[in-house]
């Protein structure tokens, strides 16, 4: 059930796909790669390990290993880029910018569309790579690839809708012209939880605007970014427009600093933790670079007495357990009004037991894969133990899964209080803590008692209450009687310390455009 949520949401009401471009994989005898504990048919042409700079695959003296979080098996080794490689990538992007910004919007649109076509044509292969490196169930990975590709499709269309303006001034012999121009080279730093979609959501907008990019993918999941490079190259994206420089954790700090401070970089877009975002903002401040940030969340999920409990439970399942709770918009704090509290908790527990099956993402029927690594498991374990020590009740789950490794049981906690770590910190795991409340004002106050504000959800059948709460929640995105809110057509972003700017939608391309005013006199 849970694995279908993402796929269902992205496929709903979609028109038939345009006939795709040429398939990357060979019709027969294509080379495959396998690893212990994984499938024997990962496509070798897409599973690249070198950096991709200036349209070329470049090895580095050092490499780092990438592991399957489900089996612990080694997927392979990837180029470990450092400061020299980062500067070379920025230079390649800068050199390509002068020509890329000058090509027609129709041509940019066409190239992005070809890239989209290749993603759709190779969607099954790309999904397997996501499951192998992130652990998420294959159906969720398939949903992510569609979501990821749709950003390229969307921004291929938005590229042709960048409009300026003409202003009639108070002086009759003057006119004001407003131009929109690409900002320049953009540094793109992406997370591991959506290793494909977080790239195309940024890169699609950047390339559509006429910018060039340097992508630093998360060290846990570099293969998806490199697979996208292979397809971008095949689609005809010019050399230097899309560059990828993977690096290990030991080099992430120095590479990130280069991408934020190099004078040839004009724009930074980052998705990740609030703590890391603050560091990057500090680096960017010295040269006053344009910055977009999508940072941490602590999403409240409020269920009022007037809510349809069954619908609320279905929404809670979708919002909480997608990608094992490892999403920035997943519900972190469940606030349930006293009148329906017991009914909600009972039905929520039943749905979890019935619908969630923990296992390897490649296994049929798996709905929850592993957490990304041991450190993530330890954090979830810490939050659960802290809650229990402070009086919370474990309704279901509450410990590491019997499979061992990076697996953790889907967990539901009741009798939760506001001082517990699972309420004050982002858990980023399959834990649903439930707080009981009495009045609407109390729920809104608890929901807003955080220094972050990415997403919020609530269930109610009271129209007046819906308007009040939607306006009062201090978040960038609100789901009303809906647990899945992400859509390529809608703006994604937060308030407070959850970030700066918006991604996706018609607003996403503006993050990569400068507004220039031209005064035209002597008329």
Curated annotation (Swiss-Prot):
Enzyme class per UniProt: oxidoreductase
Sequence positions that bind substrate: 201, 322, 486
Keyword Acetylation: yes
Catalytic activity: succinate semialdehyde + NAD(+) + H2O = succinate + NADH + 2 H(+)
Main subcellular localisation: mitochondrion
Regulation: Redox-regulated. Inhibited under oxydizing conditions.
Entry's Gene Ontology cellular component terms: mitochondrion; synapse
Biological process annotations from GO: central nervous system development; gamma-aminobutyric acid catabolic process; gamma-aminobutyric acid metabolic process; glutamate metabolic process; post-embryonic development; succinate metabolic process; synaptic transmission, GABAergic
Binding locations of NAD(+): 201, 216-219, 272-277
Record keywords, A-Z: Acetylation, Disulfide bond, Mitochondrion, NAD, Oxidoreductase, Phosphoprotein, Transit peptide
Transit peptide feature range: 1-35
Organism from which the protein derives: Rattus norvegicus (Rat)
UniProt xrefs under InterPro entries: Ald_DH/histidinol_DH (IPR016161), Ald_DH_C (IPR016163), Ald_DH_CS_CYS (IPR016160), Ald_DH_CS_GLU (IPR029510), Ald_DH_N (IPR016162), Aldehyde_DH_dom (IPR015590), Aldehyde_DH_Superfamily (IPR050740), Succ_semiAld_DH (IPR010102)
NCBIfam families: SSADH
Pathway: Amino-acid degradation; 4-aminobutanoate degradation
N6-succinyllysine sites (modified residues): 114, 123, 172, 253, 390
Role description: Catalyzes one step in the degradation of the inhibitory neurotransmitter gamma-aminobutyric acid (GABA).
Subcellular location: Mitochondrion
Protein name: Succinate-semialdehyde dehydrogenase, mitochondrial
Subunit and partners: Homotetramer.
